[in-house]
């Protein structure tokens, strides 16, 4: 696939008949796999699909608050979404140019114009047609997820059209087309066991089509109740965009005869395939050490967006740039990591945002659910950048000893040292520490010691400020208490040669700082071409088996078969459990609330897990009964009033735990119909709700963690606005520009 990508990029200079030859058409079809890359190249993708979720907050306050200055037809979100589509782009990047190529391939094969093997080998032609149908379906699906009803071209063009009469096709019509195309693809794509993984890795398979179909059938069932006039939907499935509830009506996808059964059927085709299996260790899915790409061959992965090694000619201009938008900062000489290191994330100058409090709180039992530790950098060890070159990746080197003259870390104060020696040292046996006493004026951190770590606690479990300051590393906690005062995400600050906490300020909410909370591990790229570079060669998982299980679980639950749903849910949760012999992060074993339930041995270096936590992770129906402690811990929105409501929200919680900072979660949340409710009740910066959160004492002129929402979110923000530049381009069938009333009718409600 990589070599073909290179050849395809030369297509614009070829004669148009070339794409009816065997070689030309094959290159054209390979090029349509760019559909999977569109959202991974620039800021548009992560900014579009990480704004509008409930477990992540945009770092720019106006965007995170859903300010009308950003959410309008001329604002950033309209322009980002428009750039992903590419219908009036200056380049050939974007979904519409890809659909154009898909349509060309589809018509060439269907009309019998394709030559060579396409004309003589019916099976080969059907497989190739299926790939083009699959990639067109993916492109249309993502755009419909952004906008609802969209223009879907059926032909292709090699020149400017005579008009821009881009009529929006109803969502029921779109889903009927997608399902029909993907059912054809399912029948004609090869099974993964038949695929040449060395030559065709990354190409669509029968399993990918089945997973996609399961998702589409479930989404159609999820939105069936919105297909009425109350939500602006007419008998043909078209939506009146002047209706205030049209943000729900636009989710309506029609009604099949047995959509839930179809979801179960196609999900089962993947689950029972025999090839696909859950990775035994969740962390292995994202573990990407130096010169090790083995995680990309996991049998849990059904479809990935593939890249070659960094610098490959077939990676496009920058390759996968998600590390640049999701990475976390950590370089600080004062805690023993003086510069960016190869084995830690790259410099993230364009980070789009942060997991919010709800996103961390979803991991209810962090000592049992390994996904918290394996999804986030919860602690860092002191380190120096390895190697002698800025462009040759190398393993991190040990930082200086605590008593080395080159050590530049914070020093112990007398108060810190006294508390540490009396209350912490007697039970602190980290190997690198070697039992040393804290001495005022000596450096805190040295070789192999922790540099800094995070505690994601609650106001009720706030850590005392003396204990926090006396840790043998810099502790960054969500809640710290000082007597009767409670501080929310209080930032540390230098104080002489040591540090303290600045109780006159706060982090989080509208003041997210670069180290205020744990960053994701899912996009770390130690094999980058420069130690601060943004280009990556990592593959990006799009369909994986854990999601397939949860799709089927929701379908079972909606049919009332909770026992079958629980079996599928527990497959995913059992995998997530810490197993005996694994190692917990020190901060989890010593400080994160819940550590006190671990055995004494588990609270000691090397923090090895003694007790398998699988049984602790398994769920039953009490998790959505509305009254039990298990149910309340899931933090369902107040609008989830029935058993089915809570069950569906449990599935969304489980997807959020699995897919944190993976853009796939946006799709699940959006199509569920719960997107607006969950943002309002879960994302404090976005929410206009009052009194849902705890309040703190470290405010700035009355602003900060007051317990109130800080946002202006409106439910119609669940669909993106069409960009004004695109609306101004539209015409009727005669090429006459649309008037303002027609543009208003075309635009989604509220914009």
Task: Briefly describe each language-model feature range.
Residues 95, 177, 238-248, 253-255, ...:
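Long, intrinsically disordered, low-complexity segments
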Residues 1-23, 178, 214, 553, ...:
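Bacterial Sec-dependent N-terminal signal peptides
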Residues 22, 34-44, 63-147, 162-201, ...:
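Conserved, well-structured interaction surfaces
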Residues 144-151, 193, 219-228, 560:
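Short coil/turn linking the two alpha-helices of tandem helical-hairpin repeats
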Residues 6-10, 14-67, 207, 218-483, ...:
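An aromatic- and glycine-enriched ligand-binding surface/loop that stacks and positions planar moieties
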């Amino acid at each position: 696939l990589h070599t073909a990508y290179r050849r395809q990029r030369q297509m614009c200079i070829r004669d148009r008949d070339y794409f009816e030859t065997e070689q030309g058409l094959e290159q054209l079809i390979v090029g349509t796999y760019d559909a999977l890359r569109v959202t991974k190249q620039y800021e548009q993708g992560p900014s579009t699909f990480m704004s509008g979720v409930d477990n992540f907050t945009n770092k720019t306050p106006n965007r995170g608050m859903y300010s009308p200055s950003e959410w309008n037809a001329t604002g950033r979100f309209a322009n980002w979404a428009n750039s992903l589509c590419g219908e009036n782009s200056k380049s050939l990047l974007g979904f519409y140019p890809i659909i154009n190529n898909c349509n060309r391939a589809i018509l060439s094969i269907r009309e019998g114009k394709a030559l060579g093997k396409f004309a003589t080998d019916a099976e080969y032609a059907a497989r190739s047609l299926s790939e083009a149908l699959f990639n067109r379906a993916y492109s249309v699906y993502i755009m419909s997820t952004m906008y609802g009803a969209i223009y879907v071209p059926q032909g292709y063009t090699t020149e400017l059209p005579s008009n821009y009469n881009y009529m929006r096709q109803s969502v029921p019509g779109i889903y009927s087309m997608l399902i029909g195309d993907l059912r054809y693809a399912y029948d004609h794509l090869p099974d993964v066991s038949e695929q040449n993984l060395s030559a065709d890795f990354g190409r669509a398979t029968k399993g990918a089509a089945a997973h996609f179909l399961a998702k589409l059938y479930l989404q159609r069932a999820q939105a069936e109740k919105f297909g009425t006039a109350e939500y602006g939907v007419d008998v043909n499935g078209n939506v009146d965009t002047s209706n205030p509830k049209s943000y729900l009506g636009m989710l309506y996808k029609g009604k099949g005869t047995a959509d839930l059964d179809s979801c179960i059927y196609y999900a089962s085709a993947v689950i029972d395939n025999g090839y696909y299996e859950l990775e035994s260790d969740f962390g292995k899915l994202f573990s990407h050490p130096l010169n090790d790409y083995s995680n990309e061959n996991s049998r849990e992965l059904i479809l990935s967006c593939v890249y070659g090694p960094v610098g490959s000619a077939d990676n496009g201009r920058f390759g996968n740039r998600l590390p640049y938008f999701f990475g976390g900062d950590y370089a600080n000489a004062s805690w023993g990591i003086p510069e960016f290191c190869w084995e830690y994330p790259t410099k993230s100058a364009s980070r789009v945002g942060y997991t919010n409090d709800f996103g961390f709180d979803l991991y209810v039992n962090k000592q049992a659910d390994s996904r918290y530790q394996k999804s986030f950098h919860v602690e860092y060890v002191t380190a120096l950048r390895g190697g002698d070159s800025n462009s040759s990746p190398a393993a991190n080197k040990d930082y200086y000893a605590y008593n080395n003259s080159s050590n530049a870390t914070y020093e112990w104060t007398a108060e810190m040292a006294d508390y540490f020696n009396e209350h912490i040292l007697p039970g602190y046996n980290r190997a690198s520490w070697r039992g040393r006493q804290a001495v005022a004026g000596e450096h805190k951190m040295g070789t192999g010691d922790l540099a800094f770590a995070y505690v994601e606690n609650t106001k009720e479990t706030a850590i005392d400020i003396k204990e926090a300051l006396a840790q043998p590393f810099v502790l960054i906690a969500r809640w710290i208490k000082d007597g009767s005062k409670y501080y929310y995400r209080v930032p540390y600050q230098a104080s002489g040669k040591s540090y303290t906490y600045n109780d006159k300020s706060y982090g989080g909410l509208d003041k997210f700082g670069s180290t205020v909370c744990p960053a994701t591990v899912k996009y770390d790229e130690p094999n980058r071409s420069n130690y601060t570079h943004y280009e990556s060669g990592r593959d990006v998982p799009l369909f994986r088996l854990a999601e397939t299980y949860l799709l089927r679980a929701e379908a079972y639950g909606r049919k009332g078969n909770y026992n079958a749903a629980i079996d599928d849910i527990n497959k995913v949760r059992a995998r997530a459990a810490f197993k005996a012999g694994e190692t917990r992060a020190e901060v989890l074993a010593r400080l994160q609330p819940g550590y006190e339930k671990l055995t004494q041995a588990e609270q000691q270096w090397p923090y090895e897990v003694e007790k398998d936590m699988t049984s602790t992770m398994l769920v039953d129906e009490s998790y959505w009964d509305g009254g039990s402690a298990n149910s309340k811990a899931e933090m369902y929105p107040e609008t989830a009033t029935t058993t089915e409501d809570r069950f569906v929200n449990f599935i969304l919680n489980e997807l959020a735990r699995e897919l944190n900072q993976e853009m796939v979660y946006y799709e699940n949340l959006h199509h569920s119909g719960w997107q607006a409710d969950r943002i309002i009740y879960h994302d404090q910066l976005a929410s206009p709700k009052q009194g849902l959160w705890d309040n703190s004492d470290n405010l700035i002129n009355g602003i900060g963690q007051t317990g109130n929402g800080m946002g202006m979110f409106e439910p119609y923000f669940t669909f993106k606005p069409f960009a004004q530049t695109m609306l101004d381009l539209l015409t009727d069938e005669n090429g006459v520009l649309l008037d303002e009333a027609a543009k208003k009718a075309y635009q989604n409600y509220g914009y």
